[in-house]
Every structure is written in structure tokens, then in C-alpha cells.
Amino acid sequence: MTNWIAWAAIEGALTKTKQILFEPFDLTKWVKLAIILFFIGGIGSGSSGNFSSNPFSGNFGDFGNSYSDAELDAFVTETVSEVSVFVHQYMTYIVLAVLVILLVTALFSYISSLMQFVFVESVVRNHVTIRAYIRSNLGNGLRLFILDWTLWIAFLIAIILSMLPALSSALDGDVSALSFGSFIPFFIVFVLGIIILSIIYSFINLAIPVMLYENVGILKALSKVASTAAHSVPQVLVYWIIRGVLGIIIGITAAIISIILIFIAVLIGIAVYMILTLLGFRLFDMSHLLMPRLFLFAAILLAFIIHFVTIPFPIFMRYHALLFLRSWYADIMPFWEPVTEPAPEPVPEPA
């Protein structure tokens, strides 16, 4: 019977997660890990999305009041003209805004790349010291940052190229070209791009420890991981499946925890409001001054609590990947192990 490494690594990941977080519990360590994971993002960051709304739910398919092609062409031409005038009028401000957004995005992206190495060092050694790990991984973070941006720029270029035929026709005023079929290349490129990026980032996730502990660059580490994976295809496929299932389970669990904490926060807010009302405070008289600030403070505090409580999830996932990787590179990662105290020798009974 085949020994699936990814399945066997689950128990070890649970054990190591318990050791780093609860044996013993260290609040300072938790706070440092929360800071690291905040910059990395992912599970525990408190981000969420709402995809339940449908703007077409009421009248989708009702073309009784549809416009003629001539009216649509005129509308598109007028819209393009107005946008062009706006862009030419505020070109300087638009360029400055884009540059600022790109600069801030690049800065946080570099910090996120750098924190990937800080995170690996922290969980491998069970010693979280952010500044020391940052100083020793500035170059590694830059290499990962460059690769990350290269991949996403290539993906963005592919998306733009897939939409060029439809966009060029629309800019020329040919609205009839904007059919569903004209966007099929976009959907194909988008889906294939997401799949390819997911595979690449799965290997990058495994390559980061190789970079750290074999002192090689990102491309060399990726080459080593991909070469080893090519000889263990069934293990890699099972690894991806188990990681996907674990990600779904952890995502659902994190969502449930978030909902429970939000519900508790709402109950606390209602209780505080009722107590203040009974004490004679008229909050609505100052709602325009207090409520926005109180709501913002409460939202930030709640997001931090959710992020803090869900810290074990990304740590477990990182340990799972590291233990899977250790089956390929048994000697490269200096895993911290708990020191067991020797059992006291039995005292001989007096004769």
C-alpha cells in the first residue's frame, strides 16, 4: 500500500502547531506571528467577499426596451469622447495617482514576499524574531518579489491580449462585436492562467525553504523542487488534492469563527447601548460625531480579534507543506524539537 506523504504529514503538522502556539502559550509570540501573517495575507486576515448580489436578477433577458444599433453606437461614441476629454484634462493627476498606487502596492508586495521567509524561519526554529529574520532575508524577499510581479504582469498581458479584438471593435463603435462569443478567449485565458499560477505558486511555496536552507536563488530552488516533483507525480497530485480539501475545511472553519465573533460583538454592542440608554445617555444626539468613530474602532478591533484567533490555521498549513517537503529534503530544515527531560533514575532501596 502506497504511503501518501501529504496524508501522513497532517498529524505531524497538528503536533507542531500545538507545540509552537500552546506549549507553552506565549502572547508575545502570537502577536509577532499575527504581524507576520497580516503582511502575508491569506487565511486569518479577515478578508471576505460578497458574491450574492446579481444586478441582472430583475430584468435579465427583457429586451422590450432595448436600444437600436444606431443609438448604441452613438452612446458608445459619446462615452469614449467624454472619457478621452477627461483623461486629457486631468492627465497629470491620473499619472500621479497611478504612480502612487503602484508604489504603495509594490512596497506592500515586497514586504509580503519578505515576510514569507520570516514566517518559514519562525515556524521551523520555533523562535519568532522579526527584525533579525528580515535583515537576513532582504535579498531573498527581493528575488521572490521580482518573480511574483513578473508572473502577474505576464498574466495581465495575456488577459489584455485576449480582450483586444472585442475592445478594439468597441472603441471603433461596433457594439455588435461585444457578444458573449467575443469574450470566450478571455474566459479561456483567465481560467488557464489561474490554473497555471496555482501550480507555480504551489511550487514556490515549497521552494522558499529550499532557498533558505540550501542558499540558492528562487529559480534554482524552483528547478530543484520541480525536478523532484517530476519523479513523484502521484505524491504531488495527492498533495494538491489534500491541500485543496484542507483549504476548504479551514476556510469554512474560519468563516464560522468569524460569524460567531461578529454575532458576539453585535450582542455586546446592543448590551452597551441599552445600559447607556438606561443611564440617561442620549447617544443619538451625538451620533454624527461618535458613531462613525466608534464603528470604525469596533470594526478594526473585531478584525484584529478574528485575525488573532485564526492564527493556527496558516501555521498548520505551513507546517503541512514543510513536512511534505522534508520527505524530499530530509536534512535541509533545522526543525526545532521539544527537549524532553530525562526520567529520574530510581533511588535504590536501602538494604
Identify the meaning behind each predicted range.
Residues 251, 255-274:
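Juxtamembrane/transmembrane-helix interface segments of polytopic membrane transporters
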Residues 272-288:
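Intrinsically disordered, low-complexity segments enriched in Gly and acidic/Ser/Thr residues
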Residues 1-182, 186-192, 197-251, 284, ...:
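Helix-coil boundary and N-terminal low-complexity module in membrane systems
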Residues 150, 172-174, 264-267, 276:
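Short, surface-exposed, polar/charged, turn-prone segments marking secondary-structure boundaries
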